[in-house]
Design a protein with these regions (language model features):
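N-terminal beta-alpha supersecondary unit
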Residues: 47-167, 173-177
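Conserved phosphate-binding/catalytic loops in two-lobed NTP-binding clefts
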Residues: 203-204, 432, 449-478, 492-496
Length: 524
């Protein structure tokens, strides 16, 4: 069976501030019981749900509007999706006071802009009627709203610039983990909106949202026949269980996801995260003029472009798709990478080619512990560049950049194989490896993971990565997580507070996703 890496081309290079919308309706499923025989909750779930979402866990101020049709096959529509990143370039990294000030200045204007993108009351009423007709029902809220759309506003609408628009059914927001003050900015705003609109609040876990992002992408794209071969009648992918490699500037975790709220951490970082390690290595490796001219502090992304300057075409060539419509990185980019075939090869030191004379050691090369450690290689990179000084040529810097990323990414992969060896039962259910978080946008990482999975006997495992705009922090993933938690019957108390640390693993100090106080079952 041919190995695959799923990434939806529609999202590959699209700017973040575009509005993404699906355009096809659902096929008619089996008839539902008449509306007068259903509970209020069943009737609510028979219509399209809409949420406004806020993400402020670090230095990105993000707002999104997302809707989803009823049921597990409901279509997803992203009406608004924007973010503003604080400018911390003068500090060489994220500077909390600057990030907080940016949230204070940016969040309200973004929300005001998002409200103008709310679906009109008439448009949503038509959508509700279509959903009800498809379910075998009739009448109800949709028809009534359609009649009233041009008249006085009702409890289900907001008047924005004189136009009746659908009011969100609930507000979603990041509760943690993250910077406490930054989280509080978003949570306070979300509480205010939920109170003013008299709708529920969904305060969700940031890492859970990263893990669920591919399901959001599946729900958004599976209805568009021009970009996806998947049918609107298929379940949202990936289906549980699956493995998730969460890689960002703040976290590095290998997670076994068994359900919406059941996630077990198999391996995690002992110190800094892989994204932080890449940023720090980039500060030492990249030429000073390149660092000075870069417009933000995402130096890890700049390191990839520096290491592989020919690997960034404006758009992927059409021939880069395989027979399933998935992108084949072997065809897209020639990294000249040969994966280690055995453990003895993956723990061998990297010796720089002549005329260079330095060595890099793989992280934890002398240990089989289920953990990640990125400090050691960072120290070696710093020593190499310090000893060379200004005499280090561009070619040597590029060689060091490639070797550094290679060893970091192989380290990520080795813990996957060690975890599978420690729990053979995981091999039987492993069909999908999700890679999510900011570092997942690194194409060389995807190439290394795919190659290593293939040579270790896992060609059948689908490697799924969100498009770059959804790898980094964003509010769309928060909206989707809120949507899934809401449909599962959960909501948050208005008394919830930020969680600086909040593990998704139930064995953690916080007790997992549902272990923190404030969750409650929605009333029917």
């Amino acid at each position: 069976m041919r190995s695959s890496l799923t990434i939806l081309p529609k999202w590959r290079s699209a700017p973040l501030n575009l509005l993404y919308r699906t355009i096809h309706g659902n096929p008619a499923p089996a008839s539902a019981p008449p509306s007068h025989l259903q509970s209020p909750r069943q009737q609510r779930q028979r219509r399209t749900l809409l949420t406004l979402a806020i993400e402020t866990s670090c230095d990105d101020t993000c707002v999104a509007l997302l809707s989803k049709g009823p049921g597990p096959l409901g279509r997803a529509t992203l009406y608004f999706h924007q973010k503003i990143t604080s400018d911390s370039t003068a500090y060489g990294g994220v500077y909390p006071p600057i990030a907080l000030r940016s949230h204070d200045a940016s969040l309200a204007p973004l929300i005001a802009e998002a409200l103008s993108s709310l679906p009109s009351a008439a448009e949503q009423a038509r959508s509700d009627d279509e959903d009800k007709s498809a379910k075998g029902g009739g009448g109800g809220r949709g028809g009534n709203d359609l009649k009233r759309a041009g008249s006085a506003p009702n409890n289900n609408t907001l008047t924005i610039a004189g136009t009746p628009r659908q009011k969100p059914d609930f507000v979603s927001v990041t509760r943690g983990p993250g910077m406490s003050a930054n989280l509080a900015c978003g949570i306070s705003t979300a509480k205010g909106l939920a109170t003013a609109w008299q709708v529920p609040l969904l305060a969700v876990n940031h890492m859970q949202a990263h893990a669920l992002t591919p399901r959001l992408v599946s729900a958004l794209a599976r209805q568009d026949s021009t970009t996806s071969p998947l049918s609107s009648t298929t379940a949202i992918k990936p289906e549980y269980p699956f493995l998730t490699l969460l890689v960002s500037g703040g976290h590095t975790q290998l997670v076994h996801s068994r359900s919406l709220t059941s996630h077990r951490i198999l391996a995690s970082s002992n110190n800094i995260a892989v994204g932080d390690a890449l940023d720090k290595a980039a500060r030492h490796i990249l030429p000073p003029d390149m660092l000075a001219s870069h417009g933000d502090v995402m130096y890890g992304a700049l390191l990839e472009r520096f290491a592989f300057p020919d690997s960034f075409p404006l758009s992927p060539p059409p021939s880069s798709k395989n027979s399933q419509g998935q992108h084949d990185y072997d065809h897209d980019y020639d990294y000249e990478y040969a994966p280690p075939l055995r453990r003895v090869e993956e723990i061998a030191p990297y010796t720089a080619p002549s005329p260079y004379s330095w060595i890099l050691h793989p992280p934890l090369y002398d240990s089989r512990a289920l953990s990640y450690d990125f400090n050691g290689i960072g120290s070696e990179v710093r020593k190499i560049t310090t000893s060379k000084g200004d005499s280090m040529s561009l070619g040597e810097r590029r060689t060091l950049a490639r070797a550094t990323m290679r060893l970091l990414f192989e380290h990520l992969a080795t813990r996957i194989f060690l975890a599978l060896a420690a729990e053979p039962e995981l091999n039987d259910e492993l069909q999908t490896l999700v890679v999510s978080g900011g570092v997942a946008s690194n194409r060389f990482l995807m190439h290394v993971l795919r190659k290593m999975l293939d040579v270790r006997g896992f060609k059948h495992v689908e490697l799924t990565v969100p498009p770059p705009a959804l790898c980094t922090d964003n509010a769309a993933m928060i909206a989707w997580t809120g949507m899934e938690m809401y449909e599962a019957g959960w909501e948050s108390s208005l008394s919830v507070h930020p969680e600086r640390k909040w593990s998704i693993d139930p064995s953690g100090e916080e007790g997992g996703i549902l272990g923190v106080p404030g969750w409650r079952r929605r009333q029917p």
